[in-house]
Each structure stands twice: as structure tokens, then as C-alpha cells.
């Protein structure tokens, strides 16, 4: 792939100076469409209740679930609402899951004066053997029992269950199904290799020198300032860069300053100011050479709730001079040369990880495709805007590349759907800790990591810059 294109390294590096320097034109993106309009907030009203988003989610998802249930259990299966259930009658019910979890953090429990409890310590996972699943529709709710994996499922998932209601007021599940992968438009065939670089978690302002070195080396590789002619030719095939959130370090939050007296902080400067200036300079170097899409993340200066709105251009006075810089939403979706990308900065996957038994980030990505929802745990355990007309997190169509940022390690996987869908799943690692980014080949949908964490003799077979698969 990318590393294989860097040819004749030793010859060009050790050759005498030449009067003519080779130049390589950037391989351009022929067609590009930003499809993130559903995630842009116009009117911002937080006076509405969150019940509306669950109601509209169920209304939008019900036709998909009914169709899927009839495919799985036969066209003659009875599909009923909870208020129509009869004890002992086998039928199918479509509803939204609520997962009752005794370990789930609760602000009401923490501030309770009656119990005088200590604050619950943070945990990596909040699942417990006593967790229960409750299915809700527009009118009623019922507890689920039987053949269903309680630990894996999360609140907000819309699914269809097959079984019967018992005399004890519980629903005995025999089988269940999700909406499945959405329909997918075929990708346009490409005759040449061109790459999209995925990077997340630059973590600027964290104080790590190695992270800054790796970031600058990454910029130099993409802009063609590093390596021999073969590597510069390879870098010219990077047609676009997507920065998937957490551009600033969590150390820049400076939340302790809120509790300090004003006279102690009058002449101090927020830790994020210098980090934003540094980010502006990095974006300036990148956008002068290649189109760049910048997604916000958990620690970046924008709204906390999903969908996160684009970073304000006034923070980047240098980089915004270039039209190649595009400040986008989180989640972000776009079509690049006929290949549909959809990705997040990782909050949705991290939240599902905490409240589910699923351990692998790629498994969670695939599971969200199966349930046809980007972030089912929002707004229960993950903040989101109180939508009421439509739920923008439902997959309208299946992407070709589906990624999440800020994962502990790199991972990629191609899955096939029942209707010939082909999806590349990518876990983009946190760059500040792994010094690793990802290259996606638009022609073949192959993915490889590109690492800047080590330099030495052991990297000779990977090109000295970690440009290996």
C-alpha cells in the first residue's frame, strides 16, 4: 500500500545534490460532498423534555424492525404493541430498551442527605449480574426475561423481541433481532490509489515532548517535507486529512480555576489558549498542502453534548485563510470520491463500552451498525441535544468507512452485509499516547497504521518512519 510506493530510498537519499528538484502534484479528490447537515443545530432550545427523542426514535425505527422481524420469523408473525399482549400468546413486540443498572452513577444518589453515602468511585465498566432489561413502547413497559444477553445490550436500543407474556407480567423472550445494516449505495470504482489520513487525539497542551515531535513529523510527512523522493511521491497520494477530535489535551480544561477567587486568576491565562495557538499553526501547515476536516472532541472548546458543533473559526486566524480547512461537526459524514465516510470522535463508543460487556471497539462499531443507531445511549448516559422531530443518529444509509477516534489502539476490519454492503470499520488510536495514525485507501478500502513512535535499526524494514502495515 502506502509504504510500497516509496521506492529507491537509498539511491535518492545518498545521491549527490541535483540542480533540479523533483516536485509531486497532490492527487486531488475529484468529488467531495459534506453530508453532515443533519448534525448542524439551527435553533437551540433546551426547554424540551428528552422523552421526545425516544418517541421519534421508536417511530422512525419501527418500520425497519417490523420488516426485519417478518424476514426472520416469517411474514405471518403477529406484531403487537404492549397494550395488546395476551398471556401465553406468542407474538413479536417492537420497543426501546431501558437497562436498570444498580451501579449506574446517579447524581440523586450522590446528593442524598438521607443516606449520607460517599460519592461512587469511577469505574471502567458499570455492568452487574443484577442488571435488568425493560422494554418500552408508546404506552407501556414490560420486563424481559429468557434468551437475551442482558450484559451486552444498552439503554436506548430499539429492537424486536419474539416470545410471550406470562401471568407474572413479564415477557419471556425466545429470540430477538435488530434493524440490521441500512441499504448502501455502491462506491465509485477508482483507477488509482488515493488515501485519506485519519488522526485523532493530538492532545496539544499536555506537555509531552514526544507527542509534539510525533505531531510535527506527521505534518512533515503529509506535506512532503520529510523523506526521499519516493516517500514524497507517496505523500502526494494523501488526498485528505480528517482530525477526529481531542485536538487539545484534557489537561487544558483548567476546571480548578473556577473555584478560585477572581483576584487569584485575574492575570492568569487559560491553559487552552497556548494549545489553540499551537493547533492553529499545525492546521496552517496542513491546510496549505492538503484539504483538512477538523472534528471537535470531548476536550475541545465547543459544546459538550452531541452532536458537537464545529469549532469557531475565530480560534484559527492563520489556518482559516485557506479554503482547504473545513471545521465540521461530530459526528461527521461525507462522500469522498464516491466513498461514504461516517465517524465520531469516540464518545459514543466509549459510553457503550462502559455500560456493556463488549470489550472491543470494533465490535461496538459493528454492533451500532446492526442496531442502525450511532449512539443509542444518548441521552441517558451520554449528553445530546433534545431533538423532537427526528433522531439524526439513525443511519439513513450504510457508510463505506465507519470510524471512531481516540481508541486505546489501532484496529480495522471489513464486514459484509446481507445485501452486499461492504463496510470498513476503523478504530483510530489516540495519537498523543500511541503516535499512530491511519491511512484508508479509497480504491481498495484497505487500511494501515502509520506510526511515528520509534526510529532506529529495527524500523528499517518499515521505511524508518514506521510506514508499515
UniProtKB/Swiss-Prot annotation:
Record lineage: Eukaryota, Metazoa, Chordata, Craniata, Vertebrata
An annotated GO cellular component: delta DNA polymerase complex
The entry's keywords: Acetylation, DNA damage, DNA excision, DNA repair, DNA replication, Nucleus, Phosphoprotein
Homology family: Belongs to the DNA polymerase delta/II small subunit family.
Source taxon at top rank: Eukaryota
Cellular location(s): Nucleus
Gene: POLD2
Protein name stated in the entry: DNA polymerase delta subunit 2
Modified residues (Phosphoserine): 15, 257
GO BP: DNA biosynthetic process; DNA repair; DNA strand elongation involved in DNA replication
Annotated source species: Bos taurus (Bovine)
Amino acid at each position: 500500500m502506502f509504504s510500497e510506493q516509496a521506492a529507491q530510498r537509498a539511491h535518492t537519499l545518498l545521491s549527490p545534490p541535483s540542480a533540479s528538484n523533483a516536485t509531486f502534484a497532490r492527487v486531488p479528490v475529484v468529488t467531495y460532498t459534506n453530508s453532515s447537515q443533519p448534525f448542524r443545530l439551527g435553533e437551540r432550545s433546551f426547554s424540551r423534555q428528552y422523552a421526545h427523542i425516544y418517541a421519534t426514535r421508536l417511530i422512525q425505527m419501527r418500520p425497519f424492525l417490523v420488516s426485519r422481524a417478518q424476514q426472520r420469523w416469517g411474514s405471518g408473525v403477529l406484531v403487537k404493541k404492549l397494550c395488546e399482549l395476551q398471556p401465553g400468546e406468542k407474538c413479536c413486540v417492537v420497543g426501546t430498551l431501558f437497562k436498570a443498572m444498580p451501579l449506574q452513577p446517579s447524581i440523586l444518589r450522590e446528593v442524598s442527605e438521607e443516606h449520607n453515602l460517599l460519592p461512587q468511585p469511577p469505574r471502567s465498566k458499570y455492568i452487574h449480574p443484577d442488571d435488568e432489561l425493560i422494554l418500552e413502547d408508546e404506552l407501556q413497559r414490560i420486563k424481559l426475561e429468557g434468551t437475551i444477553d442482558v450484559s451486552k445490550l444498552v439503554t436506548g436500543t430499539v429492537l424486536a423481541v419474539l416470545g410471550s407474556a406470562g401471568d407474572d407480567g413479564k415477557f419471556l423472550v425466545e429470540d430477538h433481532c435488530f434493524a440490521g445494516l441500512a441499504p448502501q449505495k455502491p462506491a465509485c470504482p477508482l483507477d488509482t490509489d488515493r488515501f485519506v489520513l485519519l488522526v485523532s487525539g493530538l492532545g496539544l497542551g499536555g506537555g509531552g515532548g514526544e507527542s509534539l515531535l510525533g505531531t510535527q513529523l506527521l505534518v512533515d510527512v503529509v506535506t512532503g517535507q520529510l523523506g526521499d523522493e519516493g516517500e514524497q511521491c507517496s505523500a502526494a497520494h494523501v488526498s485528505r486529512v480528517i482530525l477526529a477530535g481531542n485536538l487539545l489535551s484534557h489537561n487544558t480544561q483548567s476546571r480548578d480555576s473556577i473555584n478560585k477567587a477572581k483576584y487569584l486568576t485575574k492575570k492568569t491565562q487559560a491553559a487552552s489558549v497556548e494549545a489553540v495557538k499551537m493547533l492553529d499553526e499545525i492546521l496552517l501547515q496542513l491546510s496549505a498542502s492538503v484539504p483538512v476536516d477538523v472534528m471537535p472532541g470531548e476536550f475541545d472548546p465547543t459544546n459538550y453534548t452531541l452532536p458537537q458543533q464545529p469549532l469557531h473559526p475565530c480560534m484559527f486566524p492563520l489556518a482559516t485563510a485557506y479554503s482547504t480547512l473545513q471545521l465540521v461537526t461530530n459526528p461527521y459524514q461525507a462522500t469522498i470520491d464516491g466513498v461514504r465516510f461516517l465517524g465520531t470522535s469516540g464518545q459514543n463508543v466509549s459510553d457503550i463500552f462502559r455500560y456493556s460487556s463488549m470489550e472491543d471497539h470494533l465490535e461496538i462499531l459493528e454492533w451500532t451498525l446492526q442496531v442502525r443507531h450511532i449512539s443509542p445511549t444518548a441521552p441517558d448516559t451520554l449528553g445530546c441535544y433534545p431533538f423532537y422531530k427526528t433522531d439524526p443518529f439513525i443511519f439513513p444509509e450504510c457508510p463505506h468507512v465507519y470510524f471512531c477516534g481516540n481508541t486505546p489502539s489501532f484496529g480495522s476490519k471489513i464486514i459484509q452485509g446481507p445485501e452486499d454492503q461492504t463496510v470498513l470499520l476503523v478504530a483510530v488510536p489516540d495519537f498523543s499516547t500511541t503516535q499512530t495514525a491511519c491511512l484508508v485507501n479509497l480504491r481498495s478500502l484497505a487500511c494501515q497504521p502509520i506510526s511515528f513512535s520509534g526510529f532506529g535499526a529495527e524500523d528499517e524494514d518499515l521505511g524508518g518512519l514506521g510506514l508499515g502495515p
